[in-house]
Amino acid sequence: EMREYGIIRHVGVSTHSIEVLERIVEGDDFDTVMVEYSAFYPQTADLITRAHARDIGVIVMRPLGGSGRTSEMRGRIASGYRGVLTPRNLLRYALAHPGVSTVIPGARHPSRVIENVETASDMAPLSEDERSALEAESALLY
């Protein structure tokens, strides 16, 4: 109703529930949806594709897997870890999905914001092999 009166232009919703997301994608009430999607949580990939096909904007939350995983990952990197599971690659993973409109990674430090912007600005395409490696490694580690 507020849209009809010109008070608002768009309506969005945030959810962690796949069941709720399915109802949103099938309905006509929302213009955007904010969902969790990452190599740690790829279960929403198909629903993101369906939302995009219905012209529903998709905002990805927690593309790095959440603060606990991110802190642990950065600790591993500082200790010499050299696998594929890095914050940069996780951002690439989320941004590579054609149905994703934008991602909102959390950042506790200004340097992380700069790193995230640089990743998004200079993002190399993610190959299918890289995607598979990220999903496999995230499943093993977490």
Where are the model-predicted features located?
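Short beta-strand/loop segments at the ligand-binding rim of alpha/beta enzyme cores
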Residues: E1-G12, F30, G57
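Short N-terminal helix-initiation segments at or just after the protein's N-terminus
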Residues: M2, A39-D46
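Glycine-centered small-residue hotspots that permit tight backbone geometry or close packing
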Residues: G6-S14, G106, D129
